[in-house]
Amino acid sequence: MPQLEEWEIKKYWEIFQGLKPQDNKLSGSKVSPVLKNSQLPQDKLSKIWELSDIDSDGNLDFEEFCIAMRLIFDIVNGSQSDVPAELPGWLIPASKAYLIQANRAVATGNNQYDGGRSSNDDEEDEELLSDDFDWYISPTDKATYESIYNSNSDSYGRVRFQSLEGLYQTLTKVPKESISSAWNLVNPKSFETIDKDQTLVFLHILNQRENGKRVPHGVPASLRATFSKETPSYDLSESVPQVSSPTSANNKKAFGESYLQKVGRSTTNERGTDFSATEGTDWEEVRLRRELANLEDLLNKTSKESSTTQTNELGVTKHEYEQLLKYKEEQLKVKPDKNLTDVKNDIELIEGQVRELEQYYARKQAELQQLDQEIAQLS
């Protein structure tokens, strides 16, 4: 079945806007006339609503509305004979893939990633583990890890421990203690999130543990510095790389394959529809405003921290120069006849340095004001 085309998304947007959404969402009462105009039975309409309302808030945002409209048109046009039991991967918005994953986990009762393993089972497994841990990540494994990373990273490229819980549930040979140990290994600073490099190594450790290798007690020196960064990196200009789909080796199940199938990123599934491809529409404006708000928050935080640090440093330096100038002036009063020329030269030099410092401070204040004005214009 084809993905949603850009022209189709724009058509749905016109209908969506015509229903006058509030806070970019449509209530059931506003969507009901459109659904009933399809002349589909009530039970099918109820099922379509259930599939479309992914976050179960009783309203449909634009992405959810697109899902409902496509399901209706497919049945009315004969492309589908009935409402599917679950949303196909190509129709799941990337922004809501994690909700689909969570809903399926709850529906199947798999909401514990330790798989009901006992401590005795874990101890027996530990005795059978080998110590020949291999830090090398093959291209195939890296592609799989990147697919998992792309499915769970936030807008800053960071990944939370809880966001991978669906993956943990598929690891039948990895106890929760080993998962926690692997996380702590790549996250020595105990941040709430980890970056891409840390995530890939974390997944590699889980993969090795799933295949009978003991979780190591440390990481190579080449990785230690990377994992010990003092602050997370929020590089918004870095794009998510496009990776090729991994292939399974031999006949055994590839690491993360069942998990990727759940979130619609498996090699057997089509890629989900990109609802962001709506240039020139109000929906694009809404989406860009959200991104702008996030950028403004980050910029304001950075500006405040930078301004406070610069002001403090300049204030201390200025005070030191003023004290030095005062000391030299007192020396001049006490010993007016000794080295008078040298003292005057020192005073003039210090006064010049103070003036330069004040000018530098004024320039930085002007730059800060200009930055505040640019932020105000973007709002």
Swiss-Prot record:
Q: Which residues form a coiled coil?
A: 281-379
Indicate the principal place this protein occupies in or around the cell: membrane
Q: Where is this region: Disordered?
A: 235-276
Q: Where do the EH domain residues begin and end?
A: 8-98, 141-230
* One annotated Gene Ontology cellular component of this protein: actin cortical patch
Q: Which GO terms describe its molecular function?
A: actin binding; calcium ion binding; protein-macromolecule adaptor activity
Biological process per Gene Ontology, one example term: ascospore wall assembly
SMART domains found in the cross-reference section: EFh, EH
Cross-referenced Pfam families: EH, End3
In the bilayer, the protein is annotated as: Peripheral membrane protein
PROSITE patterns the record matches: EF_HAND_1, EF_HAND_2, EH
Q: Does the keyword Transport apply?
A: no
* Every EF-hand domain range: 40-75
Q: Where do Polar residues bias regions lie? A: 235-251, 264-276
Q: Which UniProt keywords apply?
A: Actin-binding, Calcium, Cell membrane, Coiled coil, Cytoplasm, Cytoskeleton, Endocytosis, Endosome, Membrane, Metal-binding, Repeat
Residues the entry annotates as binding Ca(2+): 53, 55, 57, 59, 64
Q: Per its UniProt entry, which superkingdom is the organism in?
A: Eukaryota
Q: Which InterPro entries match?
A: EF-hand-dom_pair, EF_Hand_1_Ca_BS, EF_hand_dom, EH_dom, End3
Q: Where in the cell is it found?
A: Cell membrane; Endosome membrane; Cytoplasm, Cytoskeleton, Actin patch
Q: Name the family.
A: Belongs to the END3 family.
Xref: PANTHER family: ACTIN CYTOSKELETON-REGULATORY COMPLEX PROTEIN END3, EH DOMAIN
Q: What does this protein do?
A: Component of the PAN1 actin cytoskeleton-regulatory complex required for the internalization of endosomes during actin-coupled endocytosis. The complex links the site of endocytosis to the cell membrane-associated actin cytoskeleton. Mediates uptake of external molecules and vacuolar degradation of plasma membrane proteins. Plays a role in the proper organization of the cell membrane-associated actin cytoskeleton and promotes its destabilization.
Quaternary data: Component of the PAN1 actin cytoskeleton-regulatory complex.
The protein in question is named: Actin cytoskeleton-regulatory complex protein END3
Q: Which organism is it from?
A: Meyerozyma guilliermondii (strain ATCC 6260 / CBS 566 / DSM 6381 / JCM 1539 / NBRC 10279 / NRRL Y-324)
